[in-house]
Design a protein with these regions (language model features):
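N-terminal Rossmann-like NAD(P)+-binding domain of SDR-like oxidoreductases, especially those catalyzing
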Residues: 1-125
Length: 125
């Protein structure tokens, strides 16, 4: 039996990490995407990274950026997930006031990019 395969965007955040835990309990193969700039900020998923029975067996991490459609496309094509969960966002509240265009790109335009990648893939996700 093939395992269900999911991609969780925003893997190191609170909601993304909870989703990863749930999917692993349901016997999924889970791939998590985390922003390159959040390296070292893996506290919410350290219990998985440090578990030799899970990490790189049922749970895999990928560095990426929602604003880089090429890397997103490459990751989605490489993994071929059946499900994608998007919990990613810019996590600095102050930035949303100081650089509103960045917040807009991260929360709105990135979703459009993800949907476009899925549409072009012509595979049911």
């Amino acid at each position: 039996m093939n395992k269900k395969k999911a991609l969780v965007l925003g893997a190191t955040g609170q909601d993304g990490s909870y989703m990863i835990d749930l999917l692993l309990k349901k016997k999924y193969e889970v791939h998590g995407l985390y922003r390159k700039s959040s390296v070292g900020n893996t506290g919410n998923i350290d219990h998985l990274i440090q578990n030799d029975k899970v990490y790189n067996k049922n749970f895999f991490l990928h560095k990426g950026d929602l604003l880089d459609s090429v890397s997103l496309n490459n990751i989605i094509n490489k993994i071929s997930p059946k499900e994608i969960y998007n919990f990613a966002d810019q996590d600095h509240v102050g930035w949303s006031y100081e650089i509103p265009s960045y917040s807009f790109k991260t929360t709105a335009l990135s979703v459009i990019e993800i949907l476009e990648i899925i549409r072009k893939k012509k595979q049911k996700i």
